Amino acid sequence: MPLSFTQPCSSGALLLLVVSNLLLWENVACLPLSSNDTDDDPLSIKGLLDHAMILSKNITDLNMELRRIFTISEMSAKLIDKFLSSSSSSDSYDQFMLEFLGQQELLTKNLTYCHKYSIKVPEDIEEAQNVISLEDFPILILSRMQAWNETLKNRINLSEGTPGIDDDILPIYKNIETKIAELLEDSKSILSQAYGATENVADYTLWSGLEDLQSSDEETRFLALCKLSYCLHVDIHTANFYLQFLRCVALVNSDSCLSSKTGNDS
């Protein structure tokens, strides 16, 4: 029985709502880009967006490798046995899962470790219509990369300061940190080319689970690592969606990006 963080992320449903909202936009201004920005120059808007999407894919793959390691670990097996032994029967287990998956409050509680942003992924179409504008998309990406750039530096410093702890996964975190830093620079360049702005965006709270990563309790530390991986999955999934839409608007046209075909392909 796999752990829950190996299952599809609930943020996918939220992103579908964003797509639905995009289909409702009737008048969307294109990004202020020149017609010469569609060549193979890596510093053009096309080159930056293509490179950013490659980085996003690489980060996703590395994070999936972390989750694979967590899933097959001894601690994962111990937690599964502990949970199953606490259930009096399979019926009670099934009932628990139904209740858990059906309670938005419980799902929200499990995400309290994740970064908080002033502009968040909408929870419904009505909220989406009132929250997101095209100009916000590069800022939404930038804020997430800034948050993770800081978080991963702190996470790596903790591991390096405690030899023998998480040595097997530290190289993966360092690789992710490098690619996050690259994606952060790409995001700044995209924002600069699109709107002439390059400043940092103070739009996030620090990840609140660092203390648990320092815990002497192995179970607490393991669960904190799982939550860190899940939060990264949510934000990279969100950033990748925004990159795809920005690329479509910048290199194709607004009408095509907002067509029903684009929505279905997403």
Swiss-Prot record:
Matches recorded under PROSITE patterns:
SOMATOTROPIN_2
Q: What is its main location?
A: secreted
Q: Glycosylated residues: list them.
A: N36, N58, N110, N149, N157
Q: Where does the protein end up?
A: Secreted
The organs and tissues expressing this protein are described as: Expressed specifically in the placenta. Detected only in the trophoblast giant cells.
Among InterPro entries, the record links this protein to: 4_helix_cytokine-like_core, Somatotropin/Prolactin, Somatotropin_CS
Write down the superkingdom of origin.
Answer: Eukaryota
Is Zinc tagged as a keyword? no
- Output the Gene Ontology cellular-component terms: extracellular region
MF GO annotations: hormone activity
Keywords attached to this Swiss-Prot or TrEMBL record, sorted alphabetically, are: Disulfide bond, Glycoprotein, Hormone, Secreted, Signal
The record lists the membrane-crossing segments as none
Cysteine disulfide links: C114-C231, C248-C257
Matches recorded under Pfam families? Hormone_1
Signal peptide bounds = 1-30
**Family indicated by similarity:** Belongs to the somatotropin/prolactin family.
Q: Which protein is depicted?
A: Prolactin-7A1
Q: Which organism is it from?
A: Mus musculus (Mouse)
